[in-house]
């Protein structure tokens, strides 16, 4: 039976305009009551687990610690979808969501009024992925500035008053693993290396996130 998912965290944890970095995802699953953490990516085996593997000196296992880390490193998090429909409550794939209501106003206001210089997208350019919806809704010509080797593009100064670095992550979701194994150039270039690990794709994601979130290694008072 079709269900309407309304985002549980966007308005509770809105982006802080003094922060320097913004993480943008899509939307949580319809059912959130079973989340380990009542927050963005609070379900098992998600974004925070990848960051925990990449930065074991931090604690991404509980809400209080995650909020402390985000605050300490001047990082906000939000999602691009405020509401959407699904054919049933078990649907989690982004490409199967429909009747989307986007969080464009909050994100646009944040970028216009903040000091954010880096955006991280937790999914790429497939149907209803975070980077795809963001660039389409905010009319960002990412193709002109896309560096496929680095998985990054820039938003020029003319759009939000300053140049913004945009980093397109590989989705932390296990549903993305098949696509990574079959078509992610960064993974395929080192496929033989990753074969030695129990979970090659997870190891790849951990190393990719470690490279892109290098600032989490800095000592901050």
Where are these regions (language model features)?
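C-terminal capping/extension of enzyme domains
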Residues: 1-12, 18, 43, 90-104, ...
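Short amphipathic alpha-helices and their capping/turn segments at secondary-structure boundaries
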Residues: 7-16, 60-71, 110
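Short, hydrophobic/glycine-enriched beta-strand segments
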Residues: 16-27, 41
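A general structural motif
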Residues: 17-19, 113-117, 163
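Short hydrophobic segments within beta-strands
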Residues: 23-25, 121-122, 169
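Short catalytic/ligand-binding loop motif for oxyanion handling, primarily in non-cytosolic enzymes
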Residues: 30-34, 85-88, 126-132, 174-180
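Short, surface-exposed acidic-centric catalytic microdomains
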Residues: 31-98
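Internal catalytic-core helix/loop-beta-alpha segment
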Residues: 72-141
